Structure formats: C-alpha cells, structure tokens
Design a protein with these regions (language model features):
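C-terminal extensions of enzymes
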Residues: 86-162
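Glycine-rich phosphate/ribose-binding loops and adjacent secondary-structure elements
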Residues: 1-85
Length: 162
C-alpha cells in the first residue's frame, strides 16, 4: 500500500529503496503523490510520472498553488485584493481575474470559481514540472528542492495542512 496511509518519510524511504531496482529503460510511475515537495523528492529518486487529484481537488476547496506557497482564497484578507493569484503567472485565470473576484465567486458557490481555480492550479503544476526538468538539465535539482522546502515546510504544507 504505497501512498495509502504511510507517512511521507516512509513513502520516501520506500521510493528510495525501490526505484534503483526498476528497469532504467521503463518509465517509473508513482500513483497518488501530488504535493509539490513530494513530487520533487520522488523525481530526485528516479520517478518519472505521477497522477493525483490534488491540483483539482484543492482548487475546488479554494486552495491555490503559487511559487510562494498555498493561497487559501476563502480567507477574508482576499475580499478586497485586486491582484491576480500570482503576479507573473501566465494562466488564463491570472491574466483575467483578481483574487477578490475569484473569492466572491467561490463564496457565492458559482461553479466558475472552481473552474478558474482549477485552470490556475493545473497551469501551476505544468510550470512546476517544467522547472523540475530545467533543474535536472542544469544539474541543480537538489538546490531547487531546497527552495521548495523553504516554501512548503515553512507553511507546514507537507503535513497535510492544505
């Protein structure tokens, strides 16, 4: 039962043990792992592919991924925030809508809120994986993981606090 109840530490230990035993000419797939730092750790240990509901489920629950951590759009501080979810994000949502408007839609239970937040989170994950590929190509994946740890561990993200 990998990724079904074990701690992140146990999962990382299992992945670290198993991936060297898998064939190098076959893709290595880890199901159900979707937190950014967990993905980065798994990639660092040789995993190639993932699938997980986290980007879409979290979007439906008002949790938005950014390069600075998680934004919880339902928090009152976003009532009047006219900025996009992430300033330099090029997704459709960030180019066209403010946090306050998305929060308003979410609080009104408008289905458009879930759609806009999902668009953003899926785009974030595409960019996140692109950054991982660049970090691998530039031989600085370890440094990139340290940056991610500074972001997500400081927010308590790896312990399910999102």
């Amino acid at each position: 039962g990998l990724s079904v109840g074990e701690s992140p530490e146990q999962r990382n230990e299992i992945v670290q043990y198993l991936t060297p035993q898998l064939p190098n000419d076959k893709p290595r797939y880890l199901m159900g792992v979707g937190k950014p730092l967990d993905i980065a750790y798994a990639v660092n240990n040789g995993v190639d592919m993932f699938d997980c509901v986290i980007p879409t489920r979290n979007a439906r629950n008002g949790h938005l991924f950014t390069n600075k951590g998680i934004i919880r759009i339902r928090n009152n501080k976003y009532i009047t925030d006219t900025n996009p979810i992430e300033q330099f994000c090029k997704c459709f949502t960030c180019k066209n809508y403010s946090k306050s408007y998305i929060r308003h839609l979410d609080r009104c239970n408008d289905i458009l809120a879930a759609r806009l937040m999902t668009i953003h989170n899926v785009y974030f994950y595409q960019e996140f994986m692109r950054k991982i590929r660049v970090a691998i190509a530039e031989r600085r994946l370890g440094k990139y993981i340290e940056e991610l740890e500074n972001i997500y561990l400081s927010q308590g993200e790896q312990n399910g606090n999102y």
